[in-house]
A protein has these predicted regions:
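Select subsegments of transmembrane alpha-helices in polytopic membrane proteins
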Residues: 46-58
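Soluble periplasmic/extracytoplasmic beta-strand elements of cell-envelope proteins
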Residues: 33-38, 138-144, 151-153
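Short, charged cytosolic
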Residues: 10-34
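Transmembrane alpha-helices and immediately adjacent membrane-cytoplasm interface residues
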Residues: 65-106
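Flexible, solvent-exposed short loops/turns enriched in glycine
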Residues: 3-6, 146-182
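Membrane-cytosol interface motif
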Residues: 107-127
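Alpha-helical transmembrane cores and adjacent cytosolic helix/loop segments
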Residues: 3, 8, 12, 43-49, ...
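Cytosol-/stroma-facing membrane-proximal "stalk/adaptor" domains immediately downstream
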Residues: 169-219
Length: 219
């Protein structure tokens, strides 16, 4: 059996229970629907491995070129020796970066990561039917573990009444907390904040029912 994914190990068992309870508590005071979604990663980021492999291989090839060129009597600045060294170093280093999350993260492009996580959040939003609630008042709290990014996406009924700026402070606070190791409690606080916003615009209904999953942890 394989080990747990980044998403599956993001919360402890107790934190999972607390997050689920936080969603249920928030939803008990509003007709709005909240889904907390934890993804291990939003993209494979192959360009990070390519860029990282090249940038790590380049100085090694430059260091090896004069030594090997001299050893084979081909000159200390032989371009063919350099290209061979670059290729030989690049291939294993590219694989190393691809397989090492800490290294891989160093070579991510911020704007591209933001776009890719946003696309993954949107796919999760529609894939898990947050656009299909009775009052169009579903809110997705999307956490992408590898990229260390958070998105909050709301359906049309919420967006018609709540300014997008309302979510930015929550996203920034949760992102900072997660990066400092505060996961479960910070997510619970954010869910409570989302519930407070929904309660102001979508009071509970007598016939209200839970339309969506409370917590989804992707493998």
């Amino acid at each position: 059996m394989g080990g747990k994914s980044r998403a599956e190990s993001f919360f402890t068992a107790e934190e999972r229970e607390a997050v689920t309870a936080a969603v249920q508590t928030a939803e008990s005071e509003t007709s709005g629907e909240i889904v907390a979604f934890v993804a291990p990663a939003s993209h494979d980021h192959p360009q990070a491995a390519m860029v990282g492999g090249f940038l790590l291989a380049l100085p090694l090839a430059l260091l090896a070129m004069p030594w090997l060129g001299g050893f084979f009597w081909l000159g200390r600045e032989n371009v063919w020796i350099f290209l061979i060294c670059l290729t030989l170093f690049y291939l294993p280093l590219r694989l190393l970066v691809a397989k090492t999350p800490t290294l891989k993260r160093l070579f991510l492009f911020t704007e591209q990561v933001q776009e890719e996580v946003g696309e993954a959040a949107l796919a999760a939003f529609y894939g898990h039917k947050l656009d299909a609630t009775r009052e169009r008042n579903g809110v997705l709290l999307f956490i992408s573990v590898f990229e260390r990014r958070v998105f909050i996406l709301a359906d049309k009924g919420v967006n018609d009444k709540v300014d997008a700026a309302c979510w930015r402070g929550m996203v920034d606070s949760l992102t900072t907390a997660i990066r400092h190791g505060d996961r479960g409690p910070a997510v619970c606080r954010t869910i409570a904040d989302i519930g407070t916003v929904l309660r102001q615009h979508f009071p509970p209904r007598p016939d209200d029912r839970n339309e969506l999953d409370d917590l989804i942890v992707a493998s």
